[in-house]
Regions:
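C-terminal catalytic/motor cores of large multi-domain enzyme assemblies
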Residues: 4-5, 14, 18-25, 37, ...
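Short, Lys/Arg-enriched alpha-helical microdomains
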Residues: 28-48
Length: 335
C-alpha cells in the first residue's frame, strides 16, 4: 500500500507505456516478472481495452475554475499551431496573426529585396553547416598608419582618397585568402571551386532597411586608396539602388561591419554560395597584458563564420590568424 491507501503497481517502463497506448488498467493485469512485476509480455497477453480503475479522489479536488484557464490556453496554443504533422515547421500567416489582437499591429508588405534576403538567409542556415571562430586584433599600428596616409593624401583630383578602417579590413581579408588559398573556395556537389582572386563583398545597409553586398574584385591586387574610392562609389550606388548585378553577384567572402553601431561582437550568416563571412565589431580601448604589465590598447573583435563543408577548424583558424597578422602590421599590406 502507498501513502494514499492504494496498491502500488510494479511494472516496467515499457509495460506502462504499452498499457497507456492500449487503454489498459495495470492494476487488473497479473505480472509474471520478478516479484509480480508487470512486463511487456503481460500487456501483450491482456484482453484489449480493459477498463481503467477510477482516478483517486485527489485528482478531482481541483475546481472547474482552476482547470478551465489551462484548458483554454491549450486550445489557443493548438489553434495557433500550423496544420500538418511536421514538428517545428513554420507557422502559417493566419496562425501568426491569430496570436495578436486585431488592430494591435500594422501589416507592412514585403518588397522584392526583403523576400530575396529572407529566402537566401533561410537557405544559408538550412543548408550550410556554420561554425564560428573569434579573436581580438590590436589596432593601434593600423590607426597610426591610417592617420599618416590620410595626412599625405591629395585633397582633390582623381588621386584623392580618405582611408577608413574598413578599407584596411577589406585589404587584410583579401590578402589573408591569398595566404591561405584553400579557404578561398566554394562548395559544389562535384567538388570545391578554388578561386584565384580574392573578391571581397561588403555588406552595405540601405535606408529603410535591407542591404546590398557589392564586391571589390581582385582586392588583393588593389591599393588601399583604390579599394577606398571603389568602395565609396559602390556604397553610394547601393544606397540609391543603382548597382548592376555584376556589382554584387559572386564574391568569395563577405565582410559585415557593425562597429559603427557600437556592436562589440556578433556572428553573421554566410552569404551563399560563399564559404565565409567576417563579422567585425567596434574598435575600443581595453586593458591588455604585455610583458606582465597592464597596458591600454585599441582592440577590435572579429568573428569568422565558415562553411564546415569547405573550411575545417584548423584551416579557419589559419585564415583568421593571417587576417590578424595583416591588421596588426599594416605595413605588410602596402608592399
Amino acid at each position: 500500500m502507498d501513502g494514499n491507501g492504494s496498491h502500488r503497481i510494479f511494472a516496467s517502463p515499457l509495460a506502462r507505456r504499452l498499457a497507456r497506448e492500449r487503454g489498459l488498467d495495470l492494476g487488473a493485469i497479473k505480472g509474471s516478472g520478478p516479484h509480480g512485476r508487470v512486463i511487456k509480455s503481460d500487456i501483450e497477453r491482456a484482453p484489449a481495452r480493459r477498463a481503467r480503475r477510477p482516478e483517486p479522489a485527489t485528482r478531482e479536488a481541483f475546481s472547474a475554475s482552476e482547470i478551465e484557464p489551462v484548458t483554454e490556453q491549450r486550445k489557443m496554443v493548438r489553434a495557433a499551431q500550423p496544420a500538418g504533422p511536421a514538428l517545428g515547421s513554420a507557422m502559417s500567416d493566419a496562425s501568426v496573426r491569430a496570436l495578436y489582437a486585431p488592430g494591435s499591429y500594422a501589416l507592412v508588405p514585403h518588397d522584392t529585396m526583403r523576400r530575396v534576403m529572407a529566402e537566401r538567409l533561410t537557405l544559408a542556415k538550412q543548408t550550410i553547416p556554420h561554425f564560428y571562430l573569434s579573436l581580438d586584433c590590436k589596432l593601434d599600428a593600423l590607426l597610426a598608419a591610417r592617420k599618416r596616409l590620410n595626412a599625405m593624401a591629395p585633397e582633390g583630383g582623381p588621386r584623392a582618397f580618405r582611408l577608413s578602417v574598413n578599407d584596411f579590413i577589406i585589404k587584410a581579408m583579401a590578402m589573408a585568402l591569398q595566404t591561405v588559398p584553400a579557404a578561398n573556395a566554394t562548395w559544389t556537389s562535384e567538388g570545391l571551386l578554388l578561386h584565384r582572386s580574392s573578391d571581397v563583398a561588403v555588406a552595405v545597409a540601405l535606408p529603410g532597411g535591407g542591404l546590398f553586398t557589392p564586391v571589390i574584385r581582385t582586392a588583393e591586387m588593389k591599393s588601399l586608396s583604390e579599394i577606398s574610392n571603389e568602395m565609396k562609389d559602390l556604397a553610394s550606388r547601393a544606397r540609391s539602388k543603382r548597382l548592376n548585378p555584376h556589382d554584387y553577384q559572386g564574391g568569395t567572402t563577405t565582410i559585415s561591419n557593425l562597429g559603427m553601431y557600437g556592436i562589440a561582437r556578433f556572428e553573421a550568416v554566410i552569404n551563399p554560395p560563399q564559404a565565409s563571412i567576417l563579422a567585425v565589431g567596434k574598435a575600443e580601448k581595453r586593458p591588455v597584458i604585455k610583458k606582465d604589465a597592464v597596458k591600454i590598447a585599441t582592440m577590435m573583435s572579429v568573428t569568422l563564420s565558415v562553411d564546415h563543408r569547405v573550411i575545417d577548424g584548423a584551416l579557419g583558424a589559419e585564415l583568421l590568424q593571417a587576417f590578424k597578422a595583416f591588421i596588426q602590421d599594416p605595413v605588410t599590406m602596402l608592399a
